[in-house]
Amino acid sequence: MGEDGGGGEFPPKKDGVEEGFPTKKPARQLDFTGGSDEHSLSKPAAPTVVATSVKPIISSSVPSTIRPGMTIAIGQVTQVRPTLPMATTMSNPPSQSQIVNAPIRHPIPESPKARGPRPNVEGRDGTPQKKKQCNCKHSRCLKLYCECFASGTYCDGCNCVNCFNNVDNEPARREAVEATLERNPFAFRPKIASSPHGGRDKREDIGEVVLLGKHNKGCHCKKSGCLKKYCECFQANILCSENCKCLDCKNFEGSEERQALFHGEHSNHMAYLQQAANAAITGAVGSSGFAPSPAPKRRKGQEILFNQAIKDSSRLSHFPQVNNGRTGGPTSGTSPSPVSRAGGNASSVPSKFVYRSLLADIIQPHDVRALCSVLVTVAGEAAKTSTDKRNEIENRVDDQTETSLASSAQDQPQGNNNAADVEMVATDHNQADKSGPEESNSDGVDASKVTPLSPATLALMCDEQDTIFMVAAPSPNGSVDPNGCRPNSQGQSEIYAEQERLVLTKFRDCLNRLISYAEIKESKCLSLARMHIQPPAIATVKTENGIQQQVPIVNGASRTNCQPTLNKPQPMQLMNTTSAAPATATNTQHLQKPPALSEKKDP
């Protein structure tokens, strides 16, 4: 690009352009070197920054070598940041000497109305974040500590008072911008060199992390290791630089903690999505007794959790693997061991497990309903039995009384006998009339001892009366108590006590059967877990008959059996006593068929 390269070589001169062009306008042609107009127009030159008051002429015949969005200032190439509110004018000056002599002015931010709406700033996980709103009270939103003014945007929906950062007060806003730039030319420079307001082309990709940009002021983290979202560098997905004043920083290139954090988040997120899809398809979390819960987004000390999961693998072996149906005897190939499942999960990604009860598939809703019906039936039978006993006792007492009266009447003289009989009969009738309506439901208790009740209380108690649990013996004269809603007699207390005893006894028997089922199932799972963890060694033992048998060795000691048939695996029910086996079979029928429950009397 020498000065002596003729004007007609490249690009070719055009007479039309030369004739229609003014000959002497140095301010418009920016010819500060004294060259001819033809040379200045025909030479390709380096780009430069021109003041906004100067309007240069761009020749259509000169090819442009600069891209839009680039500006050159004093031989130093810098990239224009999209968030800077600057108005730049591109031109093709004639020579390099103009770069030295061109005046340099601080660009004035353009009005926000000239730019299109900015997209919402996305976080590290791609979630759009809401635009921050300012709360200025006394600055009229024309100071740098107003986030809207510092970012070059108008206040929109903010909580500010007496705001001038809007379209109506554009002249005042312009003056504030110019005054701020005179004091600090870099006032409107964003904190991050590659501002996130532009396209998120530098977003992190698993496998190849692209990290560009630098924090102009730096972060000041002290305890987070710069691996939390409140670290501005970490939130912007850039590495900490020399501008940062953080302590114990782990946000640098090659940091194992940062890589483990990113890759762990990605793998856990993908695993959880796959698990959720499988659960949606099958309609259940899983057939086993464990349902892995979704892993948290942020994990602290993954190595500690991994080691802890390995150490707890033996504890997980005690947890059963629950099948969909009721399990029978243990077999070696019927169901996989829960230890293999726990070990597989621990080796890939440590996750939490939700323990299911041993009785998860044993107790069914119809079993609970059957138990309730059985208890109600037992209570009703107990009430009837107690009532019958009371009636029988009362009849015996009446018979004895009549017998004694008859014998005493025979011993007295005949004259006095008639008068005594009349007096006795009258007395009995009077007592029956008095005690009948008042004490028919009290079983001989004095009516004066009964606590009087209000009509509202009596109505409520009558509504809640249960015919099964409140069976009262009829009075001898057949009368009915008009206030018979509150049992206060000794007989009713005995009935309730008997009902409670029988109900609790039946419920205790049911709980004992459930405990037996759980113990049997636990023994099955433990045997399967032991077989999976440590298969029994086979040793050759010579018996008394001279026949060599192979028996398992448990804990370093071989166990020999006299009968070869005992070496075969037996069902778990046979491990209990012979009396427990039929009881278990009958117990299963009791849960399914309530009427067939066998009543066990306490010793």
UniProtKB/Swiss-Prot annotation:
This is Protein tesmin/TSO1-like CXC 5. One of its GO terms (cellular component) is nucleus. It comes from Arabidopsis thaliana (Mouse-ear cress). Belongs to the lin-54 family. Residues 1-47, 105-133, 316-347, 386-417, 429-450, 584-603 are annotated as: Disordered. The keyword RNA-binding does not apply. Plays a role in development of both male and female reproductive tissues. Residues 386-399 have a biased composition (Basic and acidic residues). PANTHER family: PROTEIN LIN-54 HOMOLOG (PTHR12446:SF34), TESMIN/TSO1-RELATED (PTHR12446). It is found in: Nucleus. The cysteine-rich domain CRC binds zinc in vitro. GO terms for molecular function: DNA-binding transcription factor activity; metal ion binding. Residues 402-417 have a biased composition (Polar residues). Ubiquitous but expressed mostly in flowers. Keywords: Developmental protein, Metal-binding, Nucleus, Zinc. One of its GO terms (biological process) is regulation of DNA-templated transcription. Residues 130-254 form the CRC domain. PROSITE patterns: CRC. Pfam families: TCR. Its main location: nucleus. InterPro entries: CRC, Lin-54_fam, Tesmin/TSO1-like_CXC.
